[in-house]
Amino acid sequence: MKKIEAIIKPFKLDEVKEALHEVGLQGITVVEAKGFGRQKGHTELYRGAEYVVDFLPKVKIEVVCEDDVCERAVEAIVNAARTGRIGDGKIFVSNIEEVVRIRTGERGEEAI
């Protein structure tokens, strides 16, 4: 099993959610996040004063899937989240050793 963590622009969330649904993934976790990379921050003007906004709003999506679905899911995220501009985000893929559904006690792929 694999865990896919994707950090994307917030306005791309619905497109990514739909793309994941199309490859057969239904359950995702979404967390509002702030961060910066190469995009860095920017300067804003508020009531006549300039200030630097270091951290930009992002959305972090987490999904656990079977190994054979992972590459299709990553491609779906890339295609749905890409704008071609700096700040489109990152995708991290890691191995998951175990999954347990708390309600039933199911383990492994049955618990996804």
What does each model-found stretch correspond to?
Residues 1-112:
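Positively charged, small/polar-rich N-terminal and surface patches that mediate targeting and assembly
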